[in-house]
Regions:
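Metal-dependent peptidase/peptidase-like ectodomains
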Residues: 215, 267, 277-381, 418-421
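Soluble metallo-hydrolase cores and metallopeptidase-like ectodomains found primarily
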Residues: 161-244, 257-260, 264, 269
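Active-site metal-coordination/substrate-binding segment of hydrolases
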Residues: 102-146, 217, 223-263
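His/Asp/Glu-rich mid-to-C-terminal helical/loop segments that flank catalytic regions of hydrolases
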Residues: 380-427
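Bacterial Sec-dependent N-terminal signal peptides
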Residues: 1-25
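Second-shell loop/turn segments in exported
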Residues: 20-24, 40-50, 77-80, 122-129, ...
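Noncatalytic luminal/extracellular "stalk/propeptide" segments of secretory-pathway proteins
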Residues: 43-146
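N-terminal hydrophobic or amphipathic helices/low-complexity stretches enriched
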Residues: 16-55, 59-70, 210-212, 217-219, ...
Length: 427
């Protein structure tokens, strides 16, 4: 008789909690937020645009509805980031007898002027024809030295992309990487002068806090990025706006809804941090900046949410976790979902290196169990980075179930009962 009473009581508690979460996290609310963020009015939410500012204001207004607190010392929900754009106004020089100009030079720099008068001024790196361009070049940006990078003309197409990449705004830096497209990989001399026009540009993350109770100094982060690709050339249907409904208005929608849910539950012993990152699409600058301002050692977990608008390869009621094997984060989440129909799986696309391709990467590199939750079929995502990534292609009911499952699965982490094992730091 007592056992029957306990079972009935437990079922009643589960039912009451289910009703509570359904009132806050449901398909109608998902659609309201998603529809706003991915609307044409947001102009594709490109960095440094009126559209992304409008999106940021909307996210901040939603955080205000949930009565989230500001970051310590902040006067609003915006975490402002100063970037520097260097536009070359004059490039002159020679590599041996070969003229150097805007056609064969790309400089990743925030210096007003660059002068290279010999091959000993900068450390020389050679990218040969047979080298993998990405694997050879991108690690160079982490080296705190001035580099002169000679790129074989076999990589001419990738070099053009590098010119576009280096022209973007970036964090101010004391070192520069200068790329030269040339067939002369063993030069005897160089003379190069680059004169730049520098312009400051502002970005902003949107950040709100739900202070904890007994473990207030420990942080759990819920994040997604709210930027996308903006406006481009019209497609065959005449659509020029990259709405980014799935990438990543979907993740940002989840962050807003989780903030609202937890603010109503008031059951977090740890402090919860809700972040909508900027500039993920253009280099992850928002999450990089955030990781420098938060104490990684006190950050016990990060739920980064990216592209959850479509069904996963396993169908509805499922999602995958990147870097599943790097901590016991995923196992904890699945344990908290016992008795439900939802299941988390390890990332099925290891060749895509997704763990280090989203906003979780910078905190993960510092040892935080920071993982991305997604449903995107990355080996066959036809609408990825296209104008067709519209709200009509998303499943609101499934999104709602995913967001509920993130809320439920995080319970023992936000309560302080469980602490995921740390990720190995990148050296």
């Amino acid at each position: 008789m007592k056992l029957s009473f306990l079972i009935i009581s437990l079922l009643l508690v589960i039912n009451v909690n289910a009703q509570k979460i359904d009132k806050v996290i449901n398909a109608a609310e998902v659609e309201r937020i998603e529809k706003t963020l991915s609307s044409d009015d947001m102009q594709g939410r490109k960095t440094f645009s009126a559209g992304i500012d409008k999106a940021g204001d909307f996210i901040a207004s939603e955080f205000a509805k949930s009565k989230l607190a500001y970051l310590d010392g902040a006067k609003n929900y915006f975490q402002e980031i100063t970037m520097v754009k260097a536009k070359a106004v004059n490039i002159t020089g020679t590599l041996d007898a070969e003229p150097l100009n805007s056609n064969n030079i790309a400089a990743n720099t925030t210096a007003e002027e660059i002068n290279i008068n010999s091959l000993t001024d900068y450390e020389v790196v050679v990218v040969k024809a047979e080298d993998d361009f990405s694997k050879t070049v991108f690690p160079l940006f982490d080296i705190k030295k001035n580099l002169l990078i000679l790129v074989d003309t076999a990589h001419a197409r990738r070099f053009k992309g590098m010119q576009r990449f280096t022209s973007n705004a970036k964090f101010s830096a004391e070192v520069s990487q200068v790329f030269v497209l040339t067939s002369n990989l063993k030069p005897a001399s160089i003379k190069l002068r680059i004169k730049n026009q520098l312009t400051e540009q502002k970005l902003k993350n949107v950040v709100g806090l739900l202070p904890g109770k007994s473990k207030k100094e420990e942080y759990v982060v819920f994040s997604g990025h709210y930027d996308h690709l903006g406006i481009g050339k019209p497609n065959a249907a005449g659509d020029s706006i990259y709405n980014g409904a799935n990438d990543d208005a979907a993740g940002t929608t989840a962050v807003i809804m989780l903030a609202n849910y937890f603010s109503k539950m008031k059951n977090n012993e740890r402090t919860l941090v809700f972040v909508a990152f900027t500039a993920e699409e253009s280099g992850g600058f928002g999450s990089q900046y955030f990781s420098k301002k938060v104490d990684a050692d006190k950050t016990v977990a990060m739920f980064n949410i990216e592209m959850i608008g479509t069904e996963s390869k396993w169908g509805t009621n499922s999602a995958y976790i990147t870097g599943y094997e790097k901590s016991d984060f995923g196992k904890i989440l699945q344990q908290n979902l016992a008795g439900t129909s939802f299941h988390f799986e390890p990332d099925p696309y290891p060749k895509q290196n997704l763990f280090y391709r989203s906003d979780n990467a910078t905190l993960a590199a510092l040892g935080v169990p920071a993982h991305t939750i997604s449903t995107s079929k990355m080996d066959s995502e036809k609408l990825y980075h296209t104008q067709e990534d519209e709200i009509e292609t998303l499943d609101m009911n499934n999104m709602s179930e995913i967001i509920k499952s993130i809320a439920i699965s995080s319970a023992s982490i936000i309560s302080g009962k469980d602490t995921p094992t740390r990720v190995e730091k990148l050296k």
